[in-house]
């Protein structure tokens, strides 16, 4: 995704200025691969691990707790671990609250699995709470789920538009899925 690309570029720049090299492993959001790489990197001569994870499972927590090298998690808040993250709930709350009064009609939401605490659970709950604080309830029939990809945003928006052609606004959990939804809207 664009955000992960920017994160890794920034980390690479800082590490390079300090004389470090970065080894990068792409896991495609597959939890088992993340765990395999955590094990691989901590058992080889690395100075630290930066993990951009979507879902933190019990296995992740155990691997993080037993890691023998410093580890920093990006994008998730895990108790007892060094983490860099933003407030997904509040950001989505502000979006939901700001929409009411600016958008007339049906407001929809395309999210991701709620196993991802930040992008899935917190963003959806924040969006719903922001709408509710302004007096609007998010209709469950106007909620779809994607999988972080442009194509999944496209498919979810197409499905939504087929079911509810008069939807006025579609909020998406990620920029990448929003790009797919925009493509579907452009074709509608």
Located regions from the model:
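Bacterial carbohydrate/catabolite-sensing allosteric modules
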Residues: 10-20, 42, 65-73, 77-188
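Short beta->alpha connector loops
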Residues: 28-31, 52-57, 176
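Active-site-adjacent beta->alpha loops and helix N-cap segments on the catalytic face
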Residues: 56-67
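Amphipathic helical "hinge" segments at domain boundaries
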Residues: 1-48, 125, 129
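Short, glycine/serine-rich, charged loops/turns that create anion-binding
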Residues: 1, 29, 56, 78, ...
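Acidic, Gly/Pro-rich loop/turn segments at junctions of secondary structure
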Residues: 51-58, 76-81
